A protein has these predicted regions:
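N-terminal helix-turn-helix DNA-binding core of bacterial DNA-binding proteins
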Residues: 2-42, 65-75
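Alpha-helical residues within the helix-turn-helix
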Residues: 35, 52-53
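Amphipathic alpha-helical dimerization/coiled-coil segments
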Residues: 2-3, 74-113
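Residues within the DNA-recognition helix of helix-turn-helix
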Residues: 47
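Beta-hairpin "wing" of winged helix-turn-helix
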Residues: 53-62, 69-71
């Protein structure tokens, strides 16, 4: 029950909900998230630490980059997906985040060419 409560507390904040929704759609870096959310790197990093510590996000390295994605395993992995499924996709902020995410993914693809 402690894991569930920790996960619910971590998710109960608007920016962290936005991060969960974004990481459910793509594997993202802190830099990606600061660009999409329009928030400072320290603030985004603090939110990411809370979400990783609660088991809602996973952090993994690829070369020099650290990426974040929605957790699929562990005691709170299923909770992460359930929380994301409850976020209304027609919410204006969620739609703005999705548009910005598409732009970040496009820029990443162009840089890789």
């Amino acid at each position: 029950m402690d894991d569930l409560l920790r996960g619910l507390r971590a998710a109960a904040e608007p920016t962290r909900l936005r991060i969960l929704a974004l990481c459910a759609r793509a594997e993202l870096t802190v830099s990606d998230l600061t660009q999409i959310l329009g928030q400072s790197q320290p603030r985004v990093s603090r939110h990411l630490k809370n979400l990783v510590d609660a088991g809602l996000l996973e952090r993994f390295r690829e070369g020099q980059w650290a990426f974040y994605r929605l957790a699929e395993t562990g005691p709170t992995g299923p909770l992460a997906r359930q929380v994301v499924d409850l976020i209304p996709v027609d919410e204006a902020t969620v739609q703005q985040d999705a548009t910005r995410l598409d732009a970040v993914k496009q820029a990443r693809a162009e840089a890789a060419e």
